[in-house]
Amino acid sequence: MTKFIFVTGGVVSSLGKGITAASLGRLLKDRGLKVTIQKFDPYLNVDPGTMSPYQHGEVFVTDDGAETDLDLGHYERFIDINLNKYSNVTAGKVYSHVLKKERRGDYLGGTVQVIPHITNEIKERLLLAGESTNADVVITEIGGTTGDIESLPFLEAIRQIRSDLGRENVMYVHCTLLPYIKAAGEMKTKPTQHSVKELRGLGIQPDLIVVRTEYEMTQDLKDKIALFCDIKKESVIECRDADSLYEIPLQLSKQNMDDIVIQRLQLNAKYETQLDEWKHLLNTVNNLDGKITIGLVGKYVSLQDAYLSVVESLKHAGYPFKKDVVVKWIDSSEVNDDNVEAYLSDVDGILVPGGFGFRASEGKIAAIRYARENNIPFFGICLGMQLATVEFARHVLGYEGAHSAELDPSTPYPIIDLLPEQKDIEDLGGTLRLGLYPCHIKEGTLAEKIYNKNDIEERHRHRYEFNNEFREQLESNGMVFSGTSPDGRLVEIIEIPKNDFFIACQFHPEFLSRPNRPQPIFKSFVEAALNYQQK
């Protein structure tokens, strides 16, 4: 039977519940268990797809096309698994589904209430995460902080699930903060005690407490927390601030967290703790020699979480070369043809990531032109690819006013446009090309050299496509369309062979990068930047 672990947080937000959950998932996976992981978000948006990146950070896309919380990116990268649409459940999605059922008459005229209707819907989605993956263990992070009014239906649902499935199949992990009071020169357990008291007031007794702390905890502090929170002493786990996130699984393993969980849930682990690969990764991260600077030209750079997976993928790509990839954040709204050199003359490579909307697009086009004309390694993603074709049409073909129909509907040269079947759809939600799609790579191209194969699958999140009416003109002037959909209709990868490294893709390769297995285009881009630096 599938076992369920719930990770809650108390005292303050941003404690690292997601990293704790992901680290535990990694430890259990390395013991030979099949793990999946899930995030409950208490906000009322159906999904983050139409939320501002300034509010929410990046939207992480799963293989099956779900637009989800950026924490799912951490989960996938840490545990090295591919998640699905059941891995992100929002209050908006739950309420929306219940209200649709009510309108259809599924409740036979009954009064629809938070208990049992909302809580039952939450429990159903919890069970689907396990059923859809055939997992041994489902780890579920509850967003927000214990005591938040928005989280109450989720906490009630996970309280009920213990009675539904049996105590031996459910475990509660609570993350808290141990603040250091400088004036007193000591750490205080009282916030943790009150947080657990709040949780117990909701009917949930933690089995394990993970304490976020700046300094090493004494045994006396652990004993005190165990006494007042009614748990075993060994179930108080210290999670100290670390220079690298990759240290956290090792910290938790050293305190036997995986053994405690396996014993408590009576799991059948196939192996003893195996962390050699993880230790090798951490050793690499801690011993990087030199740096590579990548200029990231985007419109949301004031909130760097908007490009979280891109930055992580760049970091991963530096590890095989023992290099620290440093991102120079460049606000594309401030860039133009006159000042672009001042922004980009000191970088080793230029990356233009995805985005939506007209604002700041001209700055991105200026950066792309600078990369192309000065033979600086360039990598464009999604909108970055679309604008690379626009820049080429304007400055190589001389198509003045060329643009994307998304950004300038009146352009005389719509290099990027909607597919014909999309033109009558008005709602923004649910109209994107989302999820994993196949791509065929042309022989003898840079893309083939990068992937070392001709058929790949990558995740997408876009609405507009390259307009094939202009394909022949761009090709005859030196642009190569090296990757397309299998039927040849949709452009997926473009490159300019005249340059040492100029490639852009319609898909989002950052969603499939792993710390120990960098995504191929990112790895090749960083290698090209290193070669450029050494010229």
UniProtKB/Swiss-Prot annotation:
NCBIfam families, per database record: PRK05380.1 (NF003792), PyrG (TIGR00337)
Binding positions (L-glutamine): 54, 355, 383-386, 406, 463
Keywords tagged on the record: ATP-binding, Glutamine amidotransferase, Ligase, Magnesium, Metal-binding, Nucleotide-binding, Pyrimidine biosynthesis
Binding site for CTP: 13, 148-150, 188-193, 224
Binding site for ATP: 14-19, 71, 240-242
This protein's record includes keyword NAD: no
Pathways per UniProt: Pyrimidine metabolism; CTP biosynthesis via de novo pathway; CTP from UDP: step 2/2
Protein name per the record: CTP synthase
Regulation of its function: Allosterically activated by GTP, when glutamine is the substrate; GTP has no effect on the reaction when ammonia is the substrate. The allosteric effector GTP functions by stabilizing the protein conformation that binds the tetrahedral intermediate(s) formed during glutamine hydrolysis. Inhibited by the product CTP, via allosteric rather than competitive inhibition.
Sites where the protein binds Mg(2+): 71, 141
CDD domains: CTPS_N (cd03113), GATase1_CTP_Synthase (cd01746)
The keyword Nucleotide-binding is assigned to this record: yes
Its biological purpose: Catalyzes the ATP-dependent amination of UTP to CTP with either L-glutamine or ammonia as the source of nitrogen. Regulates intracellular CTP levels through interactions with the four ribonucleotide triphosphates.
Region: Amidoligase domain, residue numbers: 1-267
Source species: Staphylococcus epidermidis (strain ATCC 35984 / DSM 28319 / BCRC 17069 / CCUG 31568 / BM 3577 / RP62A)
Subunit structure and binding partners: Homotetramer.
